[in-house]
Structures are given as C-alpha cells and as structure tokens.
C-alpha cells in the first residue's frame, strides 16, 4: 500500500501538465474525455516450459520483481502436439498493473530499462492496435535494474501492452509521447 500523500512522479506530471496539453491539442469539451493510461499488462512466455515445469515459476518470480506485484502463471488453453504442449500446462507468467504501480513501472521502463536495451533505436510508432493501445516487446528481461544479472540462469523476453482510454491511435500516440516514450521518427 502506498504512503498517504505519496503520488508517483508520472501521475503528478499527467494531472498537472499532460492533461491540459491534450485538452488544448484535441479540443475536448470535457476534461474527462482526455485519454489516460488505463492499465499495463506484462506477459512473459516461456517456450521451454514443456521440458521443465519449474521455468514458469522462475519467470513469475522475475516478473514479480520487475512489476512489484505477484505474477500469475498462465496455462495452455488447448493442446498443440507440434509444440508438445498439453492443455493446462504452465507456459508463462503475466501481471496486470493499474494505478500507482503502473505509473511507477512506466517511469522505470522509459527512464531506466529502455536506455539499457542494446541497439535501441526507439519504439515503433506502428505498434498501435487501432483502438489506442500500444504493444511492445523486450528481448531481455535483464535490462530492468531489479533483476540481479549474476543470479539469472536464463534470459527471457517479455511483451508489454499499454492500454489507454484513447479512441484513436493519434490520441494515444500524443499521450505516450507526452510521457516521454521514445518513438522512432
């Protein structure tokens, strides 16, 4: 639980500056129409889980360290013989962040993790889904400072989905640019 009176830096920035900026840019009639970030979903698929059932739980522990919240182990919905996957087998982990934890994670992602990614040239501006949500992938989970590089036995990638209340991709792009997301030109 957060301390009384504490407010994440990005949330404060949104309420004081970004909301007013977007209100003027897109000419909304009401302040409640201004898009905001609704949630962030972090998914870590562990493809090698078919051979070792402990790997999804290790991935869930790493994800919990990164997100600051307990991760849920995801299970296969149906069997796929080609991948040697049975229905109900653990195949990954995911976390859904909302409110203060979401803002704290986005702050660490934009200011600490993304600059540590090797050969990073910016986020693709085409990764929006048409409804104002943004998806991105990270190839190595060790770019986050919470992960101790010496204790990691295997490096996994992760998907990060930023869900917004924006109606269009342009609104969502403007919102995320205001949060200093480093988009490619």
Swiss-Prot record:
One biological-process term from Gene Ontology? translation
Q: What is this protein called?
A: Large ribosomal subunit protein uL5
Keywords of this entry: Ribonucleoprotein, Ribosomal protein, RNA-binding, rRNA-binding, tRNA-binding
Q: Which domain of life is it from?
A: Bacteria
Q: What binding partners and quaternary form does the record give?
A: Part of the 50S ribosomal subunit; part of the 5S rRNA/L5/L18/L25 subcomplex. Contacts the 5S rRNA and the P site tRNA. Forms a bridge to the 30S subunit in the 70S ribosome.
Molecular-function annotations in GO: rRNA binding; structural constituent of ribosome; tRNA binding
Q: Which organism is it from?
A: Chelativorans sp. (strain BNC1)
Concerning Gene3D superfamilies, the annotation shows: 3.30.1440.10
GO CC term (a single one): ribonucleoprotein complex
| Protein family (similarity comment) | Belongs to the universal ribosomal protein uL5 family.
Q: What does this protein do?
A: This is one of the proteins that bind and probably mediate the attachment of the 5S RNA into the large ribosomal subunit, where it forms part of the central protuberance. In the 70S ribosome it contacts protein S13 of the 30S subunit (bridge B1b), connecting the 2 subunits; this bridge is implicated in subunit movement. Contacts the P site tRNA; the 5S rRNA and some of its associated proteins might help stabilize positioning of ribosome-bound tRNAs.
Q: Which PROSITE patterns match?
A: RIBOSOMAL_L5
């Amino acid at each position: 639980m957060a301390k009384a009176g504490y407010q994440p830096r990005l949330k404060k920035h949104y309420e004081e500056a970004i909301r007013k900026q977007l209100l003027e840019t897109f000419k909304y009639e009401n302040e409640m129409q201004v898009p905001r970030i609704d949630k962030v979903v972090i998914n870590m698929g562990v493809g090698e889980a078919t051979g070792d059932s402990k790997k999804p739980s290790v991935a869930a522990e790493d994800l919990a360290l990164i997100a600051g919240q307990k991760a849920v182990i995801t299970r296969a919905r149906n069997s796929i013989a080609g991948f040697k996957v049975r229905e109900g087998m653990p195949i990954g982990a995911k976390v859904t962040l909302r409110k203060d934890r979401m803002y704290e994670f986005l702050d660490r992602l934009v200011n600490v993790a993304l600059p540590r990614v090797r050969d990073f040239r910016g986020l693709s501006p085409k990764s929006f889904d048409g409804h104002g949500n943004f998806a991105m992938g990270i190839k190595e989970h060790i770019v986050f400072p919470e992960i101790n590089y010496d204790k990691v036995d295997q490096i996994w990638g992760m998907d990060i989905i930023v869900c917004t209340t924006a109606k269009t991709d342009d609104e969502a792009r403007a919102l995320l640019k205001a949060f200093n997301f480093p988009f490619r030109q």
